[in-house]
């Protein structure tokens, strides 16, 4: 008897179907509830139509589930043309009887509406198409257009409810779009659309620091769990990609294998080198040698016949090659041999989510063992702290997932003196932190390096001087005769030898 109750409760659980939209199914913990309706709401240009088309296209191509697309706005020809820009051949699917586009768009010549509004004819057409094509998925774009054509909102709501009820009765999973006036205002323009649907997904395209940032939020998923909050997404060549950072799991393996920094003395300071799956951050003022350490890191990968990829956001390819040559490193040779790939771009050329997707796709294509980003601080310009933090988490999480050693640089705002490396929460995400700084000693400028942090390993705690030579950095002894080096005001420590003998026996209070 107990087993029967358990079996019955399992059957009563809400079943989900995957949408095939990358990252979205993670946010929904498996996909959309089957045989239910989902309202996708957003302002103009947020990607509502793309979402509904991608849902149908992936359902047909990945899960062999035929679909029906009902358009109240655009003509079928326009929809087919727009979908082609994402590589989706809808005409081919139509010819294969796997997709049917039902045209309910208004007459371009206009029409006079007389009598009572009724969707009975349309409901029967949709029901017939579902039976004919054995459709499992339906998309309606958009129900806002229906409200715009008729004044009696309560009547339109009743008819939309009838349509959704019929689709649920048939057993298809429906996605319908609606337009809202403001990204953080009412869910839908007419204030009633959300009440006829089981689930609500909000798409936003918010202006932040003179840039548009797209986010997705699952507001409601009736009868089942989902991830809360806004998640960044981008629209690329393959459609919508959601960055579900909250779905990332700390399940990656941890390696004890060491790799070289490319600088022998720095390896000794790190207890034998970096761990091969670690994230290293070099932070310091401009000109302290951060890019040089990146170059040595890449050179060591080349010497070990390993692939490396460099994303440069502050210098051009020609400038990088010239600077590397001054340290005896030949980037052009590495690229010609297929062991190095350099990608240069202005941070302002696109949004952080697009930069993240480019990094992930390039890593997936090139399959490097080492990744370098020069610099993170350039990408932080003109974006919100939360957006930047999500970007860093996305990059580090993907690097660890792929078991890639990552070397990132960060330019400190202070030219001399102590500086914070925790403002953007970078320090807690990275495994190793190298502090580089200028110090003034006896009227001359010197450079100092310190291994500030290294997870899981002993490391040298001393602050050591280093100089830049034609072969890269040369690390010297520590500033043993000075203290408060990183404060910007170092002063000499008085040794016992400089104290007169008469005072040596006096104990300190």
Curated annotation (Swiss-Prot):
Catalytic reactions on record: L-seryl-[protein] + ATP = O-phospho-L-seryl-[protein] + ADP + H(+); L-threonyl-[protein] + ATP = O-phospho-L-threonyl-[protein] + ADP + H(+); ATP + H2O = ADP + phosphate + H(+)
Residues reported to bind Mg(2+) 2: 291, 314
Record-given protein name: Circadian clock oscillator protein KaiC
Binding residues for ATP 1: 45-49, 85, 220-222, 224, 226, 237
CDD domains hit by this protein: KaiC-N, KaiC_C
Protein residues bound to Mg(2+) 1: 49
Family, as annotated: Belongs to the KaiC family.
Modified residues (Phosphoserine): 427
Residues spanning the membrane: none
Domain annotation KaiC: ranges: 1-243, 257-509
Other facts: The kiaA gene has been eliminated from Prochlorococcus during genome streamlining. It has been suggested that the central oscillator in Prochlorococcus does not have to be as robust as in other cyanobacteria because the former live in specific niches of the Earth's oceans; they divide exactly once a day and at the same time. Thus gene loss, and changes in kaiC function compared to other cyanobacteria, can occur.
Keywords, in A-Z order: ATP-binding, Biological rhythms, Hydrolase, Kinase, Magnesium, Metal-binding, Nucleotide-binding, Phosphoprotein, Repeat, Serine/threonine-protein kinase, Transcription, Transcription regulation, Transferase
Residues annotated as binding ATP 2: 286-291, 327, 447, 453-455, 457, 459, 461
Known EC number: 2.7.11.1, 3.6.4.-
Biological process according to GO: circadian rhythm; regulation of circadian rhythm; regulation of DNA-templated transcription
